[in-house]
Amino acid sequence: MAASSSGEKEKERMGGVSGMAGLGSTRERLLSALEDLEVLSRELIEMLAISRNQKLLQLEEENQVLELLIHRDGDFQELMKLALNQGKVHHEMQALEKEVEKRDSDIQQLQKQLKEAEQILATAVYQAKEKLKSIEKARKGAISSEEIIKYAHRISASNAVCAPLTWVPGDPRRPYPTDLEMRSGLLGQMNNPSTSGVNGHLPGDALAAGRLPDVLAPQYPWQSNDMSVNMLPPNHSSDFLLEPPGHNKENEDDVEVMSTDSSSSSSDSD
């Protein structure tokens, strides 16, 4: 009788525990099923031990405990399948979380690139607007191409394309001699027999003084006085600084006659 009463109490307890186990999570339900299996197994073993010692037949109670044990084992197997499925789902969730993190990193990288592109586009738009303003301003104060070409020709006619190292903007000197200045320079006078000396030689009085005539003197401030000696023709040496050969009274008279003729011709032309 004691065994039957304890079996009934155990059935009631198992029923209450089974009802409560259905309300928890899968982990709690598995733990509850394991506890039930442990209790039922212990109860069945105790009943078998008592029946063997007392040699009493308690088949009905043993069958009930065994049925409960089999039922709880079936529940446990179902819970195990559910736990395995949930484990697979959990692994899939972890894989999806990693994929989400990767996509999130890609989105952040794209966002950074989009911000850089936005900044570049904003700069380009600003520059385009400024250029449009400049174009509009140029259209309002437009100058014909013919006037620009004329102005360029006027600049090129009076100035060279490059300048000496000492030349700076605003310098009153011209960068390089013009065509007119070249013709009135040393080379131009040497090629012009009417203004040069006899047989293309320099006047004797100028050479005797060790200087060039005023007509052939350097026309530019950056040319030194030493250039007057270096620019002498090749057939003249430094002996001219002392006294050129053939320098006599007759030569001086010839020079005076030539200068008188040139002055008279210039006065007649006036």
Swiss-Prot record:
InterPro entries, per database record: Mediator_Med4 (IPR019258)
This protein's UniProt keywords: Acetylation, Activator, Coiled coil, Nucleus, Phosphoprotein, Transcription, Transcription regulation
Keyword Transcription regulation tagged: yes
GO cellular component: a single term: core mediator complex
Phosphoserine modifications at: 32
Protein's GO biological process: positive regulation of transcription elongation by RNA polymerase II; positive regulation of transcription initiation by RNA polymerase II; RNA polymerase II preinitiation complex assembly
Domain of life, source organism: Eukaryota
UniProt key word Phosphoprotein: yes
Compositional bias of kind Low complexity: 259-270
Pfam families in the cross-refs: Med4
Molecular function, one GO term: transcription coactivator activity
Localization of this protein: Nucleus
Segments forming a coiled coil: 26-131
Annotated spans, Disordered: 1-21, 227-270
Location of N-acetylalanine modifications: 2
UniProt record similarity statement: Belongs to the Mediator complex subunit 4 family.
Quaternary structure (record): Component of the Mediator complex, which is composed of MED1, MED4, MED6, MED7, MED8, MED9, MED10, MED11, MED12, MED13, MED13L, MED14, MED15, MED16, MED17, MED18, MED19, MED20, MED21, MED22, MED23, MED24, MED25, MED26, MED27, MED29, MED30, MED31, CCNC, CDK8 and CDC2L6/CDK11. The MED12, MED13, CCNC and CDK8 subunits form a distinct module termed the CDK8 module. Mediator containing the CDK8 module is less active than Mediator lacking this module in supporting transcriptional activation.
Role noted for this protein: Component of the Mediator complex, a coactivator involved in the regulated transcription of nearly all RNA polymerase II-dependent genes. Mediator functions as a bridge to convey information from gene-specific regulatory proteins to the basal RNA polymerase II transcription machinery. Mediator is recruited to promoters by direct interactions with regulatory proteins and serves as a scaffold for the assembly of a functional preinitiation complex with RNA polymerase II and the general transcription factors.
The name this protein goes by in its record: Mediator of RNA polymerase II transcription subunit 4
Organism of derivation: Mus musculus
